[in-house]
Amino acid sequence: MESLFPAPFWEVLYGSHLQGNLSLLSPNHSGLPPHLLLNASHSAFLPLGLKVTIVGLYLAVCIGGLLGNCLVMYVILRHTKMKTATNIYIFNLALADTLVLLTLPFQATDILLGFWPFGNTLCKTVIAIDYYNMFTSTFTLTAMSVDRYVAICHPIRALDVRTSSKAQAVNVAIWALALVVGVPVAIMGSAQVEDEEIECLVEIPDPQDYWGPVFAVSIFLFSFIIPVLIISVCYSLMIRRLHGVRLLSGSREKDRNLRRITRLVLVVVAVFVGCWTPVQVFVLVQGLGVQPGSETTVAILRFCTALGYVNSCLNPILYAFLDENFKACFRKFCCASALHREMQVSDRVRSIAKDVALGCKTTETVPRPA
């Protein structure tokens, strides 16, 4: 077996290292099929300024996304009123985003150095996390959309189906289903020496010209197209239902809440699709045998990949702007943190003032020498 797909998933398109100049790549290079030749290298080919820009973007996304997603998970765990079915799915999405954001410093280092310096174990770990995130995110968004469909179109059935415990069970099933992809990919992944550089790769079995396209197209279908189709059907039915009746639950307040949550889920799904469509399309094109042929195209691919990771730090911002409960909890957390800091400063000032006063008093009571 030869290493075909640089993994994690972002490397499927253009790999971990370009061999100096794209014009030097030929269909016979390393025995790779033509549509996978750009899996040879990217970092050594890109200008240093561009690499630094991409690395800076990765690190900014990492820091902002970790803070936001950890806050989302804390709020859901801390407040009982936040443990709704929808928020349980949001917790799962935040968990998947947090895990993949933790891999960005390693990816950024790989981009900057032009090779993988972290060894075989971390290679397998990063590969597994990246694939887990890809599938758990799309599966969770699909589950959220089906959940909203049941709430809007089948409100009576929703009373029994839409519970926190059942949402948790669905989340467990999502991670178990993601294992079907993640474990084999992690097993196939390894850090290997390719063309005098260490690369983190997934080995595709022979015949490579058959399994390579099958791998890429399967990823495209099961991690993107099929979930998006299911989501589209759910929202088409919901929109028809929302336009067909004035009151869904008999209460205007409950109706406003239903529509608000549905709008939140729709926006989260739309942003996800917008962020991931470019890189997913490139994966499909690459899998079908069409390869990019210029430095500009490779740079665009890299930024499209970065856009996919930007999605992981956008979700907490969307929750803060579109959901009143999250907004209130975020505000409460920030105010409590600010109040705690003020109290610490105040206590410190009082302590210093007390020490100064005590020192002055001691000085005054000391008898002067005759």
Curated annotation (Swiss-Prot):
Residues that carry a glycan: 21, 28, 39
Marked site positions, Important for G protein-mediated signaling: 110, 130
Disulfide bonds: 123-200
Segments passing through the bilayer: 49-74, 88-109, 125-146, 166-188, 212-236, 265-285, 301-322
Keywords attached to this entry: Behavior, Cell membrane, Cytoplasmic vesicle, Disulfide bond, G-protein coupled receptor, Glycoprotein, Lipoprotein, Membrane, Palmitate, Receptor, Transducer, Transmembrane, Transmembrane helix
Pfam families for the chain: 7tm_1
Main location: membrane
Cellular component terms per the entry's GO annotation: cytoplasmic vesicle; neuron projection; plasma membrane
Topological domains, Cytoplasmic: 75-87, 147-165, 237-264, 323-370
UniProt-listed PROSITE patterns: G_PROTEIN_RECEP_F1_1 (PS00237), G_PROTEIN_RECEP_F1_2 (PS50262)
UniProt keyword Transmembrane present: yes
Record GO biological process: adenylate cyclase-inhibiting G protein-coupled receptor signaling pathway; neuropeptide signaling pathway; sensory perception of pain
PANTHER family associated with the record: NEUROPEPTIDES RECEPTOR, NOCICEPTIN RECEPTOR
Entry's family note: Belongs to the G-protein coupled receptor 1 family.
Protein name, entry field: Nociceptin receptor
Species annotation: Cavia porcellus (Guinea pig)
Lineage: Eukaryota, Metazoa, Chordata, Craniata, Vertebrata
